[in-house]
């Protein structure tokens, strides 16, 4: 029983580390892409919304 719990705990720690690493990577990539995505949107805020038929 103890051995199983220890293995599960170890896997859980590794899983958390990988999730944390993935989260930091996605934050870095999104912060890099953010200016490009937000740029056009900010410019279009003052303009009236275009109606697509």
Swiss-Prot record:
Its main location: plastid. It comes from the Eukaryota. GO terms for cellular component: chloroplast. It is found in: Plastid, Chloroplast. The keyword Plastid applies. Keywords: Chloroplast, Plastid. Belongs to the ycf15 family. This is Putative uncharacterized protein ycf15. The gene is ycf15-A.
